[in-house]
Design a protein with these regions (language model features):
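Outer-membrane beta-barrel "beta-signal"
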Residues: 172-177, 238, 279-299
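Short glycine/proline- and aromatic-enriched beta-strand/turn motifs that initiate or cap beta-hairpins
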Residues: 24-85, 295
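Sequence/structural signature of outer-membrane beta-barrel proteins
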Residues: 38-43, 78-87, 107, 120-130, ...
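Repeated loop/turn-to-beta-strand initiation elements of outer-membrane beta-barrel proteins
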Residues: 66-71, 110-115, 151-156, 182-185, ...
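Residue-level signature of outer-membrane beta-barrel architecture
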Residues: 61-63, 104-108, 146, 177, ...
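Residues that define the transmembrane beta-barrel architecture of outer-membrane proteins
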Residues: 49-55, 92-100, 132-138, 167-171, ...
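Outer-membrane beta-barrel translocator/channel fold
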Residues: 62-64, 77-90, 189-286
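Transmembrane beta-barrel strands of outer-membrane/channel proteins
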Residues: 30-37, 73-79, 117-123, 156-160, ...
Length: 299
């Protein structure tokens, strides 16, 4: 029985490695969990303090159909916990989202082109009331990658989501470059981009990164008003491989214009009656996490 279990594990890992063949960024996280925390001040007369902790859980399951096609199932979960504190009161509020991207990746026979398409249904709410269509968002993601050579790839595409504030389109473009056997640049702009350097190959990696992540959440008990969260980050990161496929990572950076803000239903008018979701000052943040990661540049 133990031998059969080991064979299954070996088969799963072999399948995942096959699915990474031709992937432009150097790794895929099969499981990734992290917690990001920041402390800031509100721009109010009470000198209120803000503490925000963001918990993430991400899963990726690539299933190889044949030498050119891979079926992809992903799951993203988030819990955004915000606290406001001043001399009069302390209040904590939680927002949640669950995203289930499903799609296909196709690579041409000559390995020059790769196309990925995902349908992305999402529930995003405080979940204080029964789940309904008011909590549902539906989006899509399309990305084409062209390999100029083994070290240089160009990517272009489009992201769309039906947010609670309206239709949200993001054109995508990027260049992945293996500058040396230690230095890599990769990502998809304007959402994420990394400059990564291998301090100790297969053990220790560090670098600089940028992240842009816009999303919205329904406030169920407040006439379906919503919170819009525009998150821009610049940060430094450190990845420590405690085992070949297990990585402990840490990030330290600064927010740019970060403020989860509440708005009235079907408007772009700020809902001032919810002080916890009013403007805060930019702040430094710290993020730590653990991932089951498979890199295509590990021997």
């Amino acid at each position: 029985m133990g031998y059969t279990f080991i064979r299954k594990i070996v088969f799963v890992l072999a399948t995942l490695l096959l699915s990474l063949k031709g992937v432009s960024q150097p790794y895929v996280d099969i499981v990734n969990t992290s917690a990001q925390s920041l402390q800031s001040n509100y721009k109010d007369a009470l000198n209120s303090k803000n503490t925000t902790t963001d918990y993430f859980l991400n899963l990726t399951i690539p299933l190889v159909l044949d030498s050119q096609n891979t079926f992809i199932v992903r799951f993203y979960g988030e819990n955004l916990q915000s606290t406001i504190k001043n001399d009069l009161y302390t209040q904590t509020y939680n927002l949640y989202s669950t995203l289930l991207p499903i799609g296909l990746q196709h690579e041409t026979k000559n390995r020059k082109w790769k196309f990925m398409g995902l349908v992305m249904p999402k529930l995003s709410s405080d979940f204080k009331a029964k789940i309904s269509s008011y909590d549902l968002q539906v989006g899509g993601y399309g990305l084409a990658t062209y390999a100029l050579n083994k070290k240089l790839k160009i990517k272009a595409g489009l992201f769309y989501n039906r947010e609670f504030f309206g239709n949200f389109f993001v054109p995508l473009f990027s260049i992945d470059w293996d500058a040396t056997d230690r230095l890599k640049l990769y990502g998809v702009l304007p959402t994420t981009y990394r400059i990564e350097y291998a301090l100790v190959k297969q053990k220790l990696y560090a670098g600089l990164a940028f992240k842009s992540y816009t999303r919205s959440y329904r406030l169920s008990d407040a006439n379906h008003d919503y919170v819009k969260n525009v998150e821009l980050q610049t940060k430094a990161f450190l990845d420590v491989y405690i085992k070949k496929k297990f990585v402990l990572f840490a990030e330290f950076g600064r927010t740019i214009g970060y403020s989860p803000l509440a708005y009235l239903y079907q408007t772009k008018t700020e809902a001032q009656y919810i002080p916890i979701y009013t403007k805060i000052q930019d702040a430094f943040f710290f993020n730590v996490g653990l991932a089951l990661r498979i890199r295509n540049d590990f021997k």
